[in-house]
A protein has these predicted regions:
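A structural micro-motif
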Residues: 34-35, 75, 98, 261-262, ...
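Hydrophobic, well-ordered secondary-structure elements that form the walls
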Residues: 294, 335, 355, 363, ...
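Contiguous mid-protein beta-loop-alpha structural module that forms a pocket-lining wall or clamp
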Residues: 343, 359-360
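Conserved SAM/AdoMet-binding glycine-rich loop
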Residues: 77-78, 86-87, 222-345
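Glycine-centered loop/turn positions within well-structured domains
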Residues: 107, 191, 236, 272, ...
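Proteins enriched for Cys/Gly/acidic motifs involved in redox and nucleic-acid/cofactor modification
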Residues: 1-231, 236-238, 292, 313-325, ...
């Protein structure tokens, strides 16, 4: 009897690391025989790759589940990612959710769904225990626990800290809107910032083996990639879990020496890892994008201590100024959190003034969100009023806009090499420069090709 090919759609929430996870999952599901749809309304399976960095991220995932279930009641919704790892029971209680799969078991999803139309699963939805408490392969589970018949959502999670290595996540090429593939070479984090839940849902720091990284880059280049973004939860810690240790710098040198990749970009690197050697490496090769993203979080030494950050404002300023001296046209971005418990008006003023004098070119501003299980969620310090947090975030975003405008003006009139993105209008194409400026070139052009773009100060 003929059975139509099962279809799936996928939606991603969160950072570049989750982008990379979603791309790998998409490709694995395609390889398992499922067909990808661009919309959720007609898909047999809908995979939501969740984020849990803030309460708003959790809410966004829950709302997505409700919206998809209303639009497509017959779809089996699979929620995976960081929120699924942190609070699986919470997600499982939502109507429409068939499976909750934590980061610990995310790579098992294709096996879970591959033969859903061609294989009869034993048992009924209520036969099995809803959770697994230890990390186990899906093949080792009772098949009753894999039933996709209607019933309560099943939970597949495990101890994320049981994972001590990182496997290659096959990435998409450059088809569609995925012009600049993200290659995740590191996952997890051994730091314990007081506000951050990510180590508890991503596990300890793990690095992709150098030979595997080189081969993955080669595959992407053969697939047509011109630029690759290296990503990780704590990218600068790459290689510290190996014996003998290696470093991100050494890995980058191998990529430059052993592959034909035309441009490499970094997602985010912590300030203590932006060393003189690291900056010198960027200076030494035109194949590395002139773009640094360095999390700051606060310009107040008091708040940085409370956050359990492992640097102080003076070191951060030193690293940023070092970049600006070595690479005058580099883009330098930062993450900042406002409203951390105990952040006074003076603390915020210190942060604002600190950022104001630094040669940063843009900010990502976040409002503090207490995460269950983190130290900051238990602080005795008085919480900052929501209205105050909103005002502070607005002030920093305005500062970010001013800095971005000033940086763009400093580049006005230059013609810069830029890669075409899969975006544009009827008579223009959007491109991205090495130093993270978007520009428009006349005409409609294929994505993933290099062009010379003139920078205009008044262009968005």
């Amino acid at each position: 009897m003929f059975k139509p090919v099962a279809t799936f759609s996928i939606e991603n929430f969160g950072c570049r690391a989750t982008d990379a996870d979603a791309a790998a999952l998409r490709r694995s599901l395609l390889a398992s025989g499922l067909s990808l749809l661009s919309d959720h309304q007609h898909a047999d399976f809908v995979v939501l790759n969740s984020c849990t960095v803030t309460a708003a991220a959790d809410s966004q995932a829950r709302e997505a589940v409700r919206k998809i279930h209303r639009a497509n009641p017959e779809a089996r919704i699979i929620v995976t990612g960081c929120y699924a790892q942190r609070a699986p029971e919470e997600i499982a209680s939502l109507d429409g959710v068939a499976w909750v799969v934590g980061n610990s078991h995310q790579t098992e999803i294709p096996e879970l769904l591959r033969d859903f139309r061609g294989k009869q699963f034993a048992g009924s939805p209520g036969d099995a225990s809803p959770t697994t408490t230890d990390f186990v392969a899906l093949s080792a589970l009772n098949t009753d626990a894999m039933s996709l018949e209607r019933g309560p959502a099943k939970i597949l999670t495990g101890d994320i800290f049981a994972q001590t290595s990182l496997q290659a996540a096959p990435q998409d090429g450059v088809a569609g809107d995925r012009t600049r593939p993200i290659l995740k070479i590191q996952d997890g984090c051994d730091k314990r910032c007081s506000y951050c839940v990510i180590p508890f849902v991503r596990g300890r720091s793990r690095s992709l083996a150098p030979d595997v990284v080189v081969e993955e880059v080669r595959k992407l280049v053969r697939a047509g990639a011109k630029e690759i973004v290296l990503s990780g939860i704590n990218l600068g810690s790459y290689g510290r879990d190996f014996q003998p240790r290696t470093t991100l710098n050494e890995m980058v040198r191998r990529i430059l020496d052993e592959t034909a990749l035309e441009q490499l970009r970094f997602s985010s690197v912590e300030p203590q890892d932006v060393t003189e050697d690291f900056v010198g490496l960027v200076v030494s090769s035109e194949r590395i994008a002139r773009h640094f993203h360095i999390p700051l979080q606060s310009g107040s030494a008091k708040i940085l201590r409370a956050m359990h950050r492992w640097y102080r404002p003076a070191l951060y300023a030193e690293r940023v100024n070092q970049i600006r001296h070595a690479i005058p046209d580099a883009a330098i971005g930062a993450d900042v959190i406002v409203g951390f418990p105990g952040e006074s008006d003076d603390d915020f003023r210190t942060t604002y003034e600190f950022i104001d004098v630094l040669p940063l070119t843009y900010l990502h501003v976040f409002s503090f969100s207490a995460r269950p299980g983190t130290k900051a969620a238990e602080f005795d310090a008085p919480p900052v009023a929501a209205t105050v947090i909103k005002d502070r975030a607005r002030a920093l975003r305005a500062l970010s806009q001013r800095k971005a405008t000033e940086f763009r003006a400093s580049q006005s009139g230059r013609r810069l090499r830029a890669i075409a993105l899969a975006r544009g209008g009827t008579n223009w194409t959007e491109v991205l420069t090495s130093n993270y400026l978007k520009a428009r070139i006349p005409g409609r052009h294929p994505a993933n090709r290099w062009y010379d773009a003139e920078i205009f100060a008044d262009e968005e």
